[in-house]
Amino acid sequence: MNKRTYAGISEQYAKIDTSKIVLIPVPYDGTSTWQKGADKGPEAFLNASENMELYDIETDSEVYKNGIYLSEAVTENSSPEKMVAAVHAVTKTFIRKNKFVTIFGGEHSVSIGTIRAFNECFNDLTVVQIDAHADLRKEYNGSSCNHACTAYEASQNTNLVQVGIRSMDILEKSVMDPDKIFFAHEMAIDDYWMENAIDLMGKNVFITFDLDAFDPSLMPSTGTPEPGGLLWYETLDFLKKIFKEKNVVGFDIMELCPNEKDKSSDFLAAKLYYKMLSYKFDNTEEADYGNESGFKEPNNKISKFEDEEYD
């Protein structure tokens, strides 16, 4: 991945010392089981971002002026477990620098590392998983760090709220919390699903967004597309409500599997990322991601996992 700034913004808004936002690319596709190519997702996303207008009409803002630092990509791919450990370490390093940390993958197994880092750094974390798949397997193909296992650890260690689910294995029913999972077919006839989902969330929220949550008519370029998904404006409405009512401490976007002949999905992913930032900073009077936002002091929290520093 060539060294560049996010969306081609000037260096003035891209320095680590002055940027409030950090973007970590993770071009990993080691455990996907159908369409390959999610490792090309971050590059396609960044290319699309460079061709996007940076003024957001809805919020009347230019969120990039808060500073967006594009970090070096996490390229560890020797094993799923080592990739997760590397993502965990890099994410945690930037959280401790008091940045609003965002991650773009890559297949959804990447989120095991990001969720682990945020859970160690923020009190009473709610993980909002927007996804077509439940991803609640404890292990798949010999690894607990498979993309089919993305939400298992979160289901055990955080307040997990799942939205848009329309594909799962019957064994995952024994793991899921039926009161905190919103199936797509039920959402389609429930005018209050957004409010009901938000009522289940605590103060501190991390959003993990698998792009296959969208209907494939809107987002065909993903590893495992499923019919019956979310549409653009209902998704934005839901996200806007979360950012307004909760303290979103970070987010990731996963599973862009770019198609050389159709760039529309790349552009949608780029717009989604920028929209989420615009909502976050539209609702933040003074950006403080430290103790007042539920941040755990590093010396008060013993890591539950092997801790590596990636500076």
What are these regions (language model features)?
Residues 2-311:
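Conserved alpha-helical scaffold segments that buttress catalytic/binding sites
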